Amino acid sequence: DCIRAEHTVTMIAPKIGLYSADGPEYAGDLICGNLYDRLDEVIDDVDHAAEIVEPGDLVDYFAPLPTNIDKYSRGSVLIVAGSAQYPGAAIMAAKSAARAGAGYVAVAAPDACANLIRMALPSIPVFAIPSDSRGSFGAAARMTVCEIAKKYSCVLCGPGMTTSAGAMQVVSGLLELDVPL
């Protein structure tokens, strides 16, 4: 057990543990106290184990988008994922691809969970692929998924698929394609 602080005062510099693992959950608002007026002069020469990166630090890494850009010029991603047991994996993968900047995202999932994924992702197309009796990709899934995958810039495959025979056939088929996986 650990005390959940509303505020934590750390001296000289922020500590890694306050920003990683369970640290943020227990630390509360962080305040960095200064023990030495010219500390910046001293620690500028020291190698740091880590740096705190805030959203504003990343702005220069992303070029402004042209005004005439469309969704297909930012790449298309097919998410081959999910099963009746793990539909959330496909949902999270599709949301992540869209948030990361993919121009067009679609999901190919077993028909046993396709409607659930459609309800969670109304703006993302979902292909319902034949499933087996356990709600994973069925024996007929390989050819269907591979035909769909050929139309995309890249494929994300795996989250929540389980290790059924049909799922393994889908993965084998995708590995044979000339599409980044």
Regions found by a protein language model. Give the residues of each.
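Small-residue (G/A/S/T)-rich helix-start motifs and N-terminal tracts that mark the onset
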Residues: 5-7, 13-181
